[in-house]
Amino acid sequence: RVTENLEPLDRYLDEKKAKRRHRVRRYMTRPVMSTYLKTEVLGEENVKGLEGAFILVPNHSSHLDAPMVFSLLPDWITEKLATGAAADYFYRKRGISSLTSVFFNTYPILRKGKRESVEHGKAAGMTGRLLRAGVPILVFPEGTRSRSGKIGQPKAGAAALAMQVGVPIVPIAMLGGHEAMPVG
């Protein structure tokens, strides 16, 4: 069977693991982010009542983007949130993938034209599988960080998947990440 080789969804669905990841972020990520960045969240009222699976789609200009999302959004949005991470970048070494997994509940995404990681075959279709299981996801639709800080051209994948699975998309505009920690 094809599904026998796929990455199990257990760790993304396990309540105890979600609570542990959440505590790590609350007591480590949030204090670090609030120490170094002055932040402001606008429009939180637009997501009141959002539940179940959805796709968060922020622009991507810095390695600070995922920590900002997890630090600034309400707990009820981020507690079970899984993050699509570039397989060729974050899954090259087990230590990096383990660390990002603890902090951001990551799963590998293969980017077009990039070298496949060993993990990719097991994670095929992971975004759709997570959404169908009720797990909200965070993906950066540009597919990579902006080199200039300007919003890049989004790929169609998140929108196509949202329509296919029938989940809402929550756009997020993030400003200042590139200035605080530019690419390179």
Task: Indicate residue ranges for each PLM-predicted region.
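N-terminal nucleotide/polyanion-binding subdomain common to many enzyme families
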Residues: V24-M33
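Soluble catalytic domains of membrane acyltransferases
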Residues: A18, T35-G184
